[in-house]
Amino acid sequence: MELFGESDAENKRRILRYFELLEICNEINDNRPAKKGQRNVSIIQNIDGNNIVVINDIRFKGKRSINWKDVKEYLKEYVGDFYKIASTGDVIYIGSDLPSEYSGSEYTHSMRGTNAKAKANAAQGIPEIIEIAIGKHYRKNNEIKHWRNAMYGWYRYDSRFALPVYANNEIEKYNIFHASLIIRYSEDKKMYLYDIIDIKKETSNPIEP
């Protein structure tokens, strides 16, 4: 209480937000024991109070290019699953269209190098990337081809994940990436993950192993 008394309104807001995000982080990690055994994924929080999904394995390597067919096949394992965004309570479903869109969209095929590798391997952390997402921005659907599967519009959320960087076959650090989740609000009044775009490596300090 003394800390709040000495802080200005903005600092108080940041402190409260920090503890709110920390609680979300702990809750997600505590509720996912089975998933951890199948995928080497965890959630941490950086010094700015941002939750980050740490993906510890590089499953899709590709020295020159990513084999997106392998990514597509991997994503099919999620179809039919659903996950809740902790900050909003929104339930996000994984539809049968995600594997093709995620691996074959124009955005995906425009990616090269580090960002392409990041998107491919982010597939391993999709459940957690959804669960820690924040922000919620709506836009109306104006595309005829999506008049049914996005009848009630589109939402965009922000999320973060981290991937290891190796040196001499050992993890040297983890690079952090920001990403935007594109969610379609379908005619069945359910929200579906459509794609993950705008993947960019953050210039802030990387995570040490």
Name each model-derived stretch.
Residues 1-209:
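Ribonuclease/tRNase effector modules and their secretory precursors
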